[in-house]
Amino acid sequence: MENQASLNSIQKTVWDGKLPLQITLASSESRTFDQTDPYLISCPRISYLPSLLPRLRSFFASSLIEPKSQPHEGWFSFEGVPLKWHLPIGLLYDLYAGADPASKGSRPDESEQIISSVGDTLPWRLTLHFSDWPDEELVRLDADGMVMHDAFINSVKEADFLRNGTAKGIMSLSKEDSSGLWEAVQDVDLPSFQRISNILLPAPNQPFRNVPIRFFLPLPPDSGSPSLKVVQSPLPPSIPASTANATQSTVLRGKPASQLQTIGSALHSLLPNLFPSRRTPVLAKPVLHGAAVPMSAPVEEVARSAAYGDGWVYIVVRMMG
């Protein structure tokens, strides 16, 4: 496993990541004839859209047809698609608008195309609504923020159970630490987050039971299925060794040889048609925090350094070509 300093450096880079947003009030809810001025903000990738609602409600207050609307009644859409408020902003962008991520192997002409494509999608243009809540697609929020808080903590519990085989860690947290974990994500306070999350993580010399990873596969609008398909399965950090990858193999006393589970081996196991090779992206590539993930990256190292605030690694599978 990489040394802890390297993993901490990656985690800091992830938490420093931001995304420019341009948020416009839905024209059907604006009292002005022309479109209202948009709200521009650089938002942390690990944060959640509902955290913006109080300031957006104040910003658009003079333009609202319904002046009694409350911040928690707000919801967001992108190109007519309601956005899941329980997913981090960075993940939502990677799912719906992210351009093809640059990689070290890109040729100069390819890099220019990538930069041009990114420029077309940034700032990310979202529409804000305060009426006609899409009940079939989104759970309603509440004025006290408890719906959002509970959704986050439940996700933390799921990740904790997969890592340790039990959720005793999160269940035994004090009320102060439980609330503090969510507040640290909202405030993008990495030191406070690390202090609490380190209570939940197995020690560096203790492997995870399973690694909490979800793979998202965007589907075409005319597929007749939901717009997103999520693939998830228990992924242990090590797997039986193959003769083709003996360099990563370790032989434990009285146990069969094993090797590190990588992003490539996990994708090949779960999605063999899209990832026929464990080592090289052929038809699709894994994207995390807007960047292509090396197929050789061990899944546990990815989880320790680049998970979102709820402990989950959310990887978007993007088709190539």
From Swiss-Prot:
Signal peptide: none annotated. There is a cross-link at K157 (Glycyl lysine isopeptide (Lys-Gly) (interchain with G-Cter in atg12)). InterPro entries: Atg5, ATG5_HBR, Atg5_HR, ATG5_UblA, Atg5_UblA_dom_sf, ATG5_UblB. GO terms for molecular function: Atg8-family ligase activity. One of its GO terms (cellular component) is Atg12-Atg5-Atg16 complex. GO terms for biological process: autophagy of mitochondrion; cellular response to nitrogen starvation; piecemeal microautophagy of the nucleus; protein transport. Keywords: Autophagy, Isopeptide bond, Membrane, Protein transport, Transport, Ubl conjugation. Conjugated to atg12; which is essential for autophagy. Pfam families: ATG5_HBR, ATG5_UblA, ATG5_UblB. Belongs to the ATG5 family. Involved in cytoplasm to vacuole transport (Cvt) and autophagic vesicle formation. Autophagy is essential for maintenance of amino acid levels and protein synthesis under nitrogen starvation. Required for selective autophagic degradation of the nucleus (nucleophagy). Also required for mitophagy, which eliminates defective or superfluous mitochondria in order to fulfill cellular energy requirements and prevent excess ROS production. This is Autophagy protein 5.
